[in-house]
Amino acid sequence: MLDTDLCWCGSNKAYKDCHKQFDEHLNSIKLKAFKGQKRPPRNIIKNEKDIEGIRKSGIINNGALDLIASKICAGMDTETINLLAHNYIVEHDGIPACLNYEGYPKSICVSINNVVCHGIPSRDIVLKDGDIVNVDVTTILDGYYADASRMFMIGNVSDKARKLVEVTKECMEIGIKAIKPWGFVGDIGAVVEHHAHKHSYSVVEDLGGHGVGKKFHEEPFVAHFGKKNTGMLLVPGMVLTVEPMINMGARHVVLDPVDEWTIYTKDGSLSAQWEKTVLITETGTEILAD
């Protein structure tokens, strides 16, 4: 690519003024194939317009979660939570990304107690005192996706359940802190797994984070276990989710054979999850949705 050509990232800037220096640095890094190290594909690296689009989508997504935080309580059915999010997103010109995604029937996921993820909202599922609840919301605005989830503790939650929720949030925060430009995806999982195991919890391995922004799910897959200095290289312009699912019991999960969406802990133990959408910058990270 010539210096005066338009950059491959779609910024409409000359290559020399955009990603030339980036490419030179990227190509100078010697990767170790035996550690699964690899360069990211160009199509997952966002330009300034993309980042601003995801940021705006994240503002709506955050607003939906803030609204739910102000309303959620014992006695509320999970379909009401779904409608709160759906209506908020639509009223702000967004689209609920989950609705009809690969056949998913609702606008958000609401996962209670031993449900690890993908709980389907229903009038028949009513929150009770002592429940721990994950609400997972993804918004599309002008073609850009932002994804986040939060845990809510309903009424008088047991000390054991409260600790699981708190440690899971710490796992997410530690995972985000491990993200460094020119580091590796494995750096995230290594610290998350260490922190979870320190508290005698397990990390769900079947599911994880993912690239996000132009699509709901992009490369890379972000495992919340593993070893440092392995996997895809993390570079400025990548956007991904950090969303550890931490179980009080064993890590194994099962899929509901009827709805084919809801995922439970195999042993019936409690599970918790927190999620943020994270941009990798030249100097660290920026949270785009939380």
Summary of predicted features, one role per range:
Residues 3-4, 11-290:
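Active-site neighborhoods and metal-handling regions in enzymes and metal-associated proteins
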